[in-house]
Amino acid sequence: MARIAGVDLPRNKRVVIGLTYIYGIGNSTAQKILSEAGVSEDVRVRDLTADQEDKIRAVVDKYKVEGDLRREVSLNIKRLSEIGSYRGLRHRRHLPVRGQNTKNNARTRKGPAVSIAGKKK
């Protein structure tokens, strides 16, 4: 099993799909990484040679992925909250940040609906 950026890639999947298991690498970034490393997208993870793994590892190390990226995102959110911006306020209140309506929807962000006691007839 290939281990890249601290993540075990699934052996039976193609490399381009396996790379997307790393936080911060999507489909297009995985394709760029493989073209830069000179590895075919159709190769399965189990069929990678040690040399190909090292090339992919070297290219992935140039990107900010996994823990570093998670830390950066959380620090960005913390910074927005500390400076008192509107976006920071929305993050603190666990509401949608990008202007969505909250009258009817936004259940994912707000959590399960809480019933109001004493509303019975």
UniProtKB/Swiss-Prot annotation:
Family from the record: Belongs to the universal ribosomal protein uS13 family.
Name of the protein in question: Small ribosomal subunit protein uS13
Xref: HAMAP family: Ribosomal_uS13
Matching PROSITE patterns: RIBOSOMAL_S13_1, RIBOSOMAL_S13_2
Protein's organism: Ligilactobacillus salivarius (strain UCC118)
Record-linked NCBIfam families: uS13_bact
Superkingdom, taxonomy of origin: Bacteria
Subunit structure: Part of the 30S ribosomal subunit. Forms a loose heterodimer with protein S19. Forms two bridges to the 50S subunit in the 70S ribosome.
Gene Ontology biological-process annotations: translation
GO molecular function annotation: rRNA binding; structural constituent of ribosome; tRNA binding
Record has tRNA-binding as a keyword: yes
Keywords recorded for this protein, A-Z: Ribonucleoprotein, Ribosomal protein, RNA-binding, rRNA-binding, tRNA-binding
GO cellular component terms attached to this protein's record: cytosol; small ribosomal subunit
Keyword presence, Cell membrane: no
Region (Disordered): 93-121
Functional note: Located at the top of the head of the 30S subunit, it contacts several helices of the 16S rRNA. In the 70S ribosome it contacts the 23S rRNA (bridge B1a) and protein L5 of the 50S subunit (bridge B1b), connecting the 2 subunits; these bridges are implicated in subunit movement. Contacts the tRNAs in the A and P-sites.
